[in-house]
């Protein structure tokens, strides 16, 4: 599966051809300061269930504790094994939306901790043969699903933040005797969309078409194992297109890890008696 990668560095380093580390826009810092000021003046509410006087209640926090579960309904991911930490329903949905849309940046540390936990749990989902093949490659890339241009301009790189956290958890969980360097690298960019950049107001077919278009790969990945990371999976089409792009560039996609998985639409069908 691997092609004689160079010796592992003593600490993670960017791959050749990657741009410098992400720069956080000044607007993001200003927003954070304003939110901190508002938190002093306004009473806090749980981002999940709305309970007063707490930013995140213990019950909602426990929903991010795992364990990891396979996501069989992500048909769009093809044969890529997808695992999720929790279900994208109820309070979890409110948590993720609040965090990724910028209204609850105070959840960042909580989500990072959830990502680290997912990274620590993921090696347990692997068969021994697969784990051995990954270790022999000496490097494992943790690659986030690509963010759109608007989110990049705002500095809200949710999937990239999660990937960083997953990589930290993975590095701690992997057996110490295995000479494996775990690298989090944001090397995918979305392909130009058909029509306007924003997906709102578009038909479901057009949205699926845009998501399924393979992204661009910015760095050499031939012979390297890759774990894809995203915040939410619904149909799996985004993860599937990312895997196809990476595999076309010679990478070995070993799986995908998400914070939450939307339930299967088939599981939500309600049968009305007498109809």
Model features per residue range: what roles?
Residues 1-275:
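Glycine-rich phosphate/pyrophosphate-handling loop used in enzymes and phosphotransfer proteins
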């Amino acid at each position: 599966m691997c092609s004689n990668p160079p010796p592992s560095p003593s600490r993670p380093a960017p791959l050749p051809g990657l741009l410098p580390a992400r720069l956080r826009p000044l607007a993001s810092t200003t927003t954070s300061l304003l939110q901190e000021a508002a938190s002093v003046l306004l009473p806090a509410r749980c981002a999940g269930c709305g309970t007063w006087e707490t930013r995140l209640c213990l019950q909602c926090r426990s929903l991010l504790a795992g364990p990891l579960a396979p996501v069989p309904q992500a048909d769009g991911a093809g044969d890529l094994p997808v695992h999720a930490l929790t279900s994208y329903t109820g309070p979890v949905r409110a948590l993720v939306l609040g965090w990724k849309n910028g209204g609850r940046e105070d959840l960042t540390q909580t989500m990072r901790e959830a990502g680290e936990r997912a990274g620590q749990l993921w090696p347990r989902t692997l068969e021994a043969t697969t784990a051995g093949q990954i270790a022999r490659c000496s490097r494992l890339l943790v690659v986030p699903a690509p963010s759109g241009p608007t989110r990049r301009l705002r500095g809200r790189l949710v999937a990239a933040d999660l990937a960083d956290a997953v990589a930290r958890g993975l590095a701690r969980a992997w057996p110490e005797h295995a000479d494996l360097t775990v690298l989090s690298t944001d090397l995918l960019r979305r392909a130009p969309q058909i029509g306007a950049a924003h997906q709102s107001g578009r038909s479901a077919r057009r949205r699926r078409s845009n998501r399924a278009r393979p992204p661009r790969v910015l760095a050499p990945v031939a012979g390297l194992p890759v774990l894809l990371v995203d915040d939410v999976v619904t149909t799996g089409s985004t993860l599937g297109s990312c895997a196809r792009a990476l595999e076309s560039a010679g990478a070995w996609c070993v799986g995908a890890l998400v914070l939450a998985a939307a339930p299967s639409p088939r599981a939500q069908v309600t049968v009305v008696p007498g109809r």
